[in-house]
Amino acid sequence: MRKWLAILLTVLLIPVLPASAEEESTVLTGKTAAEIVEMMGFGWNLGNTLDATGGNTDDVTAQEQSWGNAKITPELMVRVKEAGFDTIRIPVTWYRYTSDDGTYTIREDFLQHIREVVEWAREADLFVILNMHHEAWIN
C-alpha cells in the first residue's frame, strides 16, 4: 500500500514542477550525485508551515501560520537566497487535503498552492527538496 501511495503522489506531483524545469534540469545531465549535492550548497528548512497540521483546511494557506510561522511569500524565498542559501527543503503534510473516499486524491487547490510555493523558490534560484512529511498513516 505504501509503495502505491508513493507512486500515486509522485505522479500527482509531476505537474507541480514548472514547465521550464526540463530545460533547466539539463544542466545536471552527466553530473554525479556528489556533484549535484555540491551544487546544492547550504540549505534552509521551510519547516512548520506546509507540514503543520493546524488551521482551517478550507483555506490552503491557513496551516502555514498555525504553528507560529510567517506566511510563505515570494519575498521570503528571495530573502533565503540573499542570506546565502542555495537549497530549500519544503516539507508537506498531505493527509489533511486528501479525499476520504479511499482514493487519497489530493485537493487541486492545495496542489496549486504547493506548485506556487515551489515556483517562488525556483524563481529565487533555489534548488527545491519537496519532502513528504507527517504521513505515518500510510503505514
Residue ranges and their predicted role:
Residues 1-7:
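Positively charged n-region of N-terminal signal peptides that target proteins for export
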Residues 7-16:
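Bacterial N-terminal signal peptides
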Residues 31, 37-139:
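Active-site mouth of glycoside hydrolases
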